[in-house]
């Protein structure tokens, strides 16, 4: 059996589509399998840093994204029970852009997927990959369409961009622990969009509350995005306090009660669409798991590879950055030459690249999340920020919000 494809990408979020674009620019034959029809809303804070915007330029969608995105985010905010602080956002000293902006995922994901299609990728949507078997250079993947039709397709490598909380295909090797026992500290993520809210133009605010953290920002078309993560035990308490209204509205009610700044921001707001929820989320590093499981030709990207606590709002930028790192590693070898040894070497190099790029962000995000979720820490932090607002600017800088993309010259770059 010969490979029909050079790369099969599982998942058409920012990471999967960006990887497909990068490989398409290098002339690879790529197929993307996405389980949901587009456009679709997604649980996400929806902001993108200056580095992320530059990565979109390299992918060929920067101009379209900038034309649709919300205002420049030149200020950073902190909201808690007793404090509301705003400070200048740290500016990126290198590259074309100084600060980030926000755009809804239903628009971003569609832009990236259509760009991948324009570069020759074939799209199966909605569809799933149920099983993967084989070896680097020749994997057989069981594709199931929405109507239930099944077929086997052959590919040289697999790119797993299916996220971190949903089911993964059967790779014929021990799993990743997604069925771990429930714990009180498990985090569930929620998101809603609002009209007529007032989060402050150009302000990306962090929300600190007992048992969770969140963020609020003005995105495209005047919409406001509110997203948060809440511990399992705190969510259960919310539902007891606000029974009969659903998990999302219960969380919103608790946030309004706990946080004066958020209450003021949403005073005249009306929610657009239902609350969305996913989880439990899985902050941590998983980029090297395929190699440990004997899957040298299966490369993880996006949240499947690893994720930071969402508090720092770097998920999309990290996804695009990781996709660029991976596509450059893969495109360095002719696809027809990929075998076990070459795939293993690329896996090891990519994992090193990934850790070098993101390890600091993950550690800082983990520390910030604990500070925000614990009132005994968040209270003093809010008091300190009121006295010295510049600490908020430096905290954002420490979370790499002003870090340039720092990639080699792209395979293709969109004109400014």
Residue ranges and their predicted role:
Residues 328-416:
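C-terminal helical "tail/cap" subdomain of flavin- and related membrane-associated enzymes
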């Amino acid at each position: 059996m010969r490979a029909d494809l050079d790369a099969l990408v599982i998942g058409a979020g920012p990471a999967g589509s960006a990887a497909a674009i990068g490989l398409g620019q290098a002339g690879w034959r790529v197929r993307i399998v996405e389980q949901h029809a587009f456009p679709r809303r997604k649980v996400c804070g929806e902001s993108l840093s200056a580095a992320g915007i530059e990565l979109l330029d390299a992918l060929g969608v920067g101009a379209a994204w900038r034309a649709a995105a919300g205002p420049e985010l030149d200020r950073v905010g902190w909201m808690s029970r007793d404090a509301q602080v705003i400070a200048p956002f740290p500016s990126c000293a290198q590259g074309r852009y100084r600060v980030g902006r926000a755009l809804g995922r239903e628009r971003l994901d569609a832009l990236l997927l259509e760009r991948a299609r324009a570069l020759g990728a074939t799209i199966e949507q909605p569809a799933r990959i149920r099983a993967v078997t084989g070896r680097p250079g020749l994997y057989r993947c069981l594709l199931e369409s929405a109507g239930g039709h099944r077929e086997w397709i052959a590919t040289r490598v697999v790119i797993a961009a299916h996220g971190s909380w949903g089911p993964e295909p059967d790779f014929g090797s021990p799993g990743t622990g997604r069925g771990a026992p429930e714990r009180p500290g498990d985090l569930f993520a929620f998101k809603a969009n609002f009209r007529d809210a007032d989060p402050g133009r150009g302000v990306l605010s962090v929300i600190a509350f007992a048992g969770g953290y969140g963020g609020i920002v003005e995105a495209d078309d005047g919409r406001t995005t509110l997203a948060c993560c809440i511990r399992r035990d705190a969510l259960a308490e919310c539902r007891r306090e606000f029974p009969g209204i659903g998990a999302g509205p219960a969380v919103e009610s608790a946030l309004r009660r706990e946080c004066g700044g958020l209450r003021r921001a949403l005073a005249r707001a009306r929610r657009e669409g239902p609350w969305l929820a996913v989880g439990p989320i899985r902050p941590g590093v998983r980029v090297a798991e395929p190699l440990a499981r004997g899957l040298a030709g299966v490369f993880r990207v996006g949240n499947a590879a690893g994720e930071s606590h969402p508090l720092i709002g770097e998920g999309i930028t990290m996804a695009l950055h990781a996709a660029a790192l991976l596509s450059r590693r893969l495109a360095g070898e002719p696809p027809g030459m990929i075998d076990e040894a070459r795939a293993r070497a690329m896996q090891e190099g990519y994992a090193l690249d990934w850790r070098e790029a993101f390890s600091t962000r993950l550690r800082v995000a983990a520390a910030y999340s604990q500070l925000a979720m614990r009132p005994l820490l968040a209270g003093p932090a809010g008091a300190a920020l009121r006295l010295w607002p510049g600490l908020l600017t430096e905290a954002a800088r420490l979370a790499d919000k002003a870090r340039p993309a720092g990639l080699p010259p792209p395979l293709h770059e969109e004109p400014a």
